[in-house]
């Protein structure tokens, strides 16, 4: 599929027809009628438009019955960087050494023992479970400012990770990836180009190559119902270490 995108004559409808044909014979490619909400808990739906991302995140939280003012254990997050003054370079390096770099996939485990701290599972890290000062931002449709249920004065910043833009997904990979095709169709209809290539082709290439083993090409604006409540049972649970800012920093 990625190779096919190099054909200058290939249109969006032709590409979708190829996906549909391949899906009939190859279980690694799925022509999907809806976004699978269970998958979003550990592998974000990939979208082009920011509005789609925010809408899917809020739909995800809604079907799981997540309260507006707090996170449920098991909700996915994406690290959006470290918000620390330059003088605290060592603390920044400590956080980054534990895997909290921009774009890192994280699962929320619960509130930490100290105000502003969250217990987190950093996906792929050697010691994945930590407690860190956190600034967690939940964006909502038609609201300019995100809601911040957990905010330390400084620390690691996070966005919700149930959906992410394809641009932000560059450099990341997941076993199974869901691509929200209506967004790519919109990009194709607009006729936009990027670096001399149709934008939809660049988006499609990045999106499908994020998948390590399975691709779901979602063609309808629908969301499945969860098969179970959000939980953290799939994560290896250990006592998280405190990755704290120095005590004087918090005063």
Indicate residue ranges for each PLM-predicted region.
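Conserved helicase motor core of P-loop NTPases
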Residues: 1-140
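C-terminal accessory regions
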Residues: 118-250
């Amino acid at each position: 599929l990625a190779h096919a995108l190099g054909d200058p004559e290939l249109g969006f409808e032709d590409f979708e027809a190829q996906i549909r044909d391949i899906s009939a014979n190859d279980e690694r490619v799925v022509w999907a009628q809806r976004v699978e909400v269970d998958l979003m808990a550990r592998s974000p739906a990939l979208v082009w438009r920011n509005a789609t991302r925010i809408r899917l995140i809020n739909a995800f939280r809604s079907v799981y019955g997540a309260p507006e003012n707090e996170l449920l254990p098991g909700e996915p997050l994406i690290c959006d960087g470290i918000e620390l003054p330059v003088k605290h370079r060592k603390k920044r390096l400590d956080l980054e050494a534990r895997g909290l770099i921009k774009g890192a996939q994280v699962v929320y485990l619960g509130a930490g023992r100290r105000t502003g701290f969250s217990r987190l599972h950093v996906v792929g890290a050697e010691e994945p479970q930590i407690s860190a000062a956190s600034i967690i931002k939940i964006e909502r449709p038609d609201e300019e400012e995100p809601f911040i249920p957990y905010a330390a004065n400084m620390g690691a910043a996070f966005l919700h990770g149930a959906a992410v833009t394809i641009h932000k997904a560059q450099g990341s990979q997941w076993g199974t990836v869901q691509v929200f095709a209506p967004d790519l169709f919109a990009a194709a209809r607009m006729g936009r180009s990027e670096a001399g290539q149709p934008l939809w082709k660049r988006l499609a290439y990045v999106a499908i190559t994020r998948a390590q083993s399975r691709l779901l090409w979602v063609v309808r604006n629908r969301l499945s119902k969860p098969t179970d409540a959000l939980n953290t049972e799939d994560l290896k649970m250990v006592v998280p270490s405190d990755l704290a800012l120095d005590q004087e920093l918090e005063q």
